[in-house]
Amino acid sequence: MIGRLNHVAIAVPDLEAAAAQYRNTLGAEVGAPQDEPDHGVTVIFITLPNTKIELLHPLGEGSPIAGFLEKNPAGGIHHICYEVEDILAARDRLKEAGARVLGSGEPKIGAHGKPVLFLHPKDFNGCLVELEQV
């Protein structure tokens, strides 16, 4: 069911500074900022040879990233994202196995324009997991 690692998401207090660090210090290919109002974030994707890094910064009132940064002012790893071929089948199988899907349980369109779901971190060793349909 689980596919390749799509990205590791890192919440950052200063999006421009974080992007510059990846671009200038590490020599990475850094994309342009994208506002994702449905998710309350602005994101920048960093392309690596084998996966991506997603930099997350709060967007708007009630952003879940704002709460994360309040607890972790320097930022930190927010979630990991795995690819799945059929997000509804994956959701149903995970729920049957006892995993909790966050929100309404229905996929939303993510930053790549594909359906995504999030799984409760308490069900995955403290790690928030995102599933993205490929």
Curated annotation (Swiss-Prot):
Q: Which cofactor does it need?
A: Co(2+); Mn(2+)
Q: Which residues form the VOC domain?
A: 4-134
Keywords recorded for this protein, A-Z? Cobalt, Isomerase, Manganese, Metal-binding
Stated EC number for the protein is: 5.1.99.-, 5.1.99.1
Q: Does the keyword Kinase apply?
A: no
PROSITE patterns registered for this protein in UniProt: VOC
Q: Which GO terms describe its molecular function?
A: metal ion binding; methylmalonyl-CoA epimerase activity
Q: Kindly list the positions annotated as binding Co(2+).
A: 7, 79, 130
Q: Which residues form the active site?
A: 130
- GO biological process annotations for this chain's record? L-methylmalonyl-CoA metabolic process
Task: Specify the enzyme's EC class, one word.
Answer: isomerase
The superkingdom listed in its UniProt entry is Bacteria
Q: Which note does the record give on the cofactor?
A: Can use Co(2+) or Mn(2+) as cofactor, but Mg(2+) and Ni(2+) cannot support enzymatic activity.
Reaction(s) catalysed by this chain's protein: (2R)-ethylmalonyl-CoA = (2S)-ethylmalonyl-CoA; (R)-methylmalonyl-CoA = (S)-methylmalonyl-CoA
Purpose of the protein: Promiscuous isomerase that catalyzes epimerization of both ethylmalonyl-CoA and methylmalonyl-CoA. Has thus a dual role in the ethylmalonyl-CoA pathway for acetyl-CoA assimilation required for R.sphaeroides growth on acetate as sole carbon source.
Question: Could you say which protein family the record assigns here?
Answer: Belongs to the methylmalonyl-CoA epimerase family.
The name of this protein is Ethylmalonyl-CoA/methylmalonyl-CoA epimerase
- Species the sequence originates in: Cereibacter sphaeroides (strain ATCC 17023 / DSM 158 / JCM 6121 / CCUG 31486 / LMG 2827 / NBRC 12203 / NCIMB 8253 / ATH 2.4.1.) (Rhodobacter sphaeroides)
Q: Which gene encodes it?
A: epi
